[in-house]
Amino acid sequence: MKVTALGNTLTGFGQALATTLGVDTTSSSPNCAEMMVVFARGTSEPGNVGLFSGPTFFDALEVMMGAGAVSVQGVEYGASIEGFLQGGDPAGSAAMAGIVEGTVQNCPNAKIVMSGYSQGGQLVHNAAAMLPAATMAKISSLVIFGDPNDGKPIANADPSKVMVVCHPGHNICDGRDLVLVEHLTYSRDAVEAATFAAARAKA
């Protein structure tokens, strides 16, 4: 119960900060585009794409791919501390897998990016393991910021399509559960990550 209360407090703080900064923490774009990003936010982040890495990543992709070329669908899931401690929310993992499968079926010509931050990275790992190899072969790139599973391969994914961004000394990337300042600075890696995803899309 205390863990849940803490998570709710952090989510409220994150949404207040996002509002102050004018950052949109929710994205639902089912329409097909040249690039389709399926993104899972981190634990206790607001909205469905969060604040600390997703929005800046999407903005950088839009610059590189062109106006209107990028569509983003955030994964709706609890993003609770309990889910993180489970290795990634099971329902959220299944939801992400379902969104990716549906996107592959409905937008066969799109360049699909699976991405997540922190617990969202766990969802990327879990969803990839749930999806058939034929579906994963159609994924253009996979980008994870602050991966709790850092160093573990993503199931059914070509390693050349994978980019994992982890800062030195980042407690979460080291397999622990203490959130320090390194965990909150992944927006600075947006351009590097977007450059990778855009290059993969154009390969």
Curated annotation (Swiss-Prot):
The keyword Signal applies. Its main location: secreted. Disruption phenotype: Abolishes penetration of the host cuticle. Abolishes conidiomata formation on the host. The active site is at 118 (nucleophile), 170, 183 (proton donor/acceptor). It catalyses: cutin + H2O = cutin monomers. Gene3D superfamilies: alpha/beta hydrolase. Pfam families: Cutinase (PF01083). The keyword Hydrolase applies. It is an enzyme of class 3 (hydrolase). It comes from the Eukaryota. It is found in: Secreted. One of its GO terms (molecular function) is cutinase activity. The 2 disulfide bonds play a critical role in holding the catalytic residues in juxta-position; reduction of the disulfide bridges results in the complete inactivation of the enzyme. Residues 1-18 form the signal peptide. Disulfide bonds join 32-107, 166-173. Induction: By contact with cutin. The record marks 119 as: Transition state stabilizer. One of its GO terms (biological process) is carbohydrate catabolic process. Catalyzes the hydrolysis of complex carboxylic polyesters found in the cell wall of plants. Degrades cutin, a macromolecule that forms the structure of the plant cuticle. Allows pathogenic fungi to penetrate through the cuticular barrier into the host plant during the initial stage of fungal infection. This is Cutinase pbc1. The lineage of its organism: Eukaryota, Fungi, Dikarya, Ascomycota, Pezizomycotina.
